[in-house]
Curated annotation (Swiss-Prot):
Role description: Binds 23S rRNA and is also seen to make contacts with the A and possibly P site tRNAs.
Protein name as annotated: Large ribosomal subunit protein uL16
Region of interest: Disordered: 1-21
Cross-referenced Pfam families: Ribosomal_L16
Keywords recorded for this protein, A-Z: Ribonucleoprotein, Ribosomal protein, RNA-binding, rRNA-binding, tRNA-binding
Subunit structure: Part of the 50S ribosomal subunit.
GO annotation terms (biological process): translation
NCBIfam families named in the record: rplP_bact (TIGR01164)
Listed GO CC annotations: cytosolic large ribosomal subunit
Native source species: Borreliella burgdorferi (strain ATCC 35210 / DSM 4680 / CIP 102532 / B31)
Signal peptide location: none
Length: 138
């Protein structure tokens, strides 16, 4: 699963996401993309599940790019632990996804197959998504 190799600070405050994506909102590498229609955090496990679903569908043809990276730590205290004694340990890593973010890109396959693969990936994610083709975003 994806996670940072090294971070300046191990733990971070939660924070909130708002607004639309200013960066990462255009298809840069592939012909097809999966764009977020909502704002949310996506875990490294969800990204990996979506990647596996796509690559299994397209088999050997084509190439997949993951355009989001989980670099925000999510901490959690163990179950049945009393409050206090400091902040919990890092449980998993999240990727911030804003409205309009291109999360995955694909090329080297026909459009129908790409759409099916992206649909499978979309079902693994906690946000509503839209399949886009590079010619649509010009």
């Amino acid at each position: 699963m994806l996670s940072p190799k090294k971070v300046k600070y191990r733990k971070k405050q939660r924070g909130r996401l708002s607004g639309e994506a200013q960066k990462g909102n255009k298809i840069s590498f592939g012909e097809y993309g999966l764009v977020s229609l909502e704002t949310n955090f996506i875990t490294a496990r969800q990204i990996e599940a979506a990647r596996i679903a796509m690559t299994r569908k397209i088999k050997r043809g084509g190439r997949v790019w993951i355009r989001i990276f989980p670099d925000i730590p999510y901490t959690k205290k163990p179950a049945e632990t009393r409050m206090g004694k400091g902040k919990g340990g890092v449980d998993h890593w999240n990727a911030p996804v804003k409205l309009g973010t291109v999360m995955f890109e694909m090329s080297g396959v026909v459009e129908e197959l790409a759409q099916e693969a992206m649909s499978l990936a979309s079902s693994k994610l906690p946000v509503k998504t839209m399949f886009v083709v590079r010619r649509d975003l010009r």
